[in-house]
Amino acid sequence: AKVSRKPREPRTAVTQSTRRIKRKKTLSKPRSRGGVKAPKTTMKIKRALRRNLRRKIQTSAGQPKKAKKARKHFVSYYVLKKSGQNKKTNQNKRQNQNKRQNQNKRRGQPVPEQEIMEKPTTSCKWCSQGVTRRGRRY
């Protein structure tokens, strides 16, 4: 069986503090209703330091800046330049052709003339016809 004890009463009398009237806090900034931010009333002016200004003037006078080029639409053209690998293969083809011609001359056979024509690597309709986009033949 549980026995509940009475809480001990303090021997000294406790004086109850009188209630103070709570005052509403005074806000430093007026709050706007509706969650909209109020525009700032003060503006800060940024000032450059004097020595920095002098440096900037000296550097800008010595080296004028280049004008930036405006961006243009990206258009891809078929590149007619040969890469280093293509040049090597062409040299090998020519060497082989020269060897054949020399062998045929030694045998006394007529030399068949062949033109070396590179096939375009892309499936572009202009490239397969041997015409660039600007209408020039190569």
UniProtKB/Swiss-Prot annotation:
Residues 1-138 are annotated as: Disordered. One of its GO terms (biological process) is cell differentiation. The record marks 126 as: Binding to nucleic acids. It is found in: Nucleus; Chromosome. Keywords: Chromosome, Developmental protein, Differentiation, DNA-binding, Nucleosome core, Nucleus, Phosphoprotein, Spermatogenesis. Residues 19-34, 43-57, 65-74 have a biased composition (Basic residues). The N-terminal half is highly basic. Involved in nuclear basic protein transition: histones are replaced by spermatid specific proteins which are themselves replaced by protamines in late spermatids. This is Spermatid nuclear transition protein 4. It comes from Sus scrofa (Pig).
